[in-house]
Amino acid sequence: KGFDFLGFNVRKYGQKLLIKPSNSSIKSFLESIRLEIKKGISTPVARLLSSINRKIVGWANYYRHVVAKKVFDNVDSAIFHILHRMIKRKHPKKSAAWLYRKYYTHRGMRQWMFIAPYTTNHGEKRIVWLKKAADIPIRRHRQVISVATPYDAEWFDYFDKRAKKMSYLEQAVGSNAFGLMRV
């Protein structure tokens, strides 16, 4: 069964040790999304979507270093269904075709992408898209060479190159801050 620690489930499957998001953290995240939607049923959908997008990106960035791709897909599907039920409740007399035209679009091979059109204060028409956790790339932790130490002068170049590479690769999706400070 493994154990849960800081929202992660650490478990051995056969000969492999896999770290995944724990079921309790997934449930609490989806519950927070449900509550956000319930609270914001009367707010404009664009504002609600941008609030949900911030939560999705933050949650996915936290779990992006572990085995989480299938979990991200399942979370995206659950959020989509929660939002779909919300708009059906919000517009009970409208047809499915009307709902599709107003709240969904397609881009490339992706269909049924949830959107919320809005107008800015300057009169510009814009669209907010529902972000998907599955779009955030999984990045594994790069292991440090076991004999390397940042306090030894002969390894300074190694840690400089590593810091530059990591700061580029490990930057959190959706933020401007680097994920790794220079050593």
Q: What does each model-identified segment do?
A:
Residues 1-183:
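Non-catalytic terminal/accessory segments
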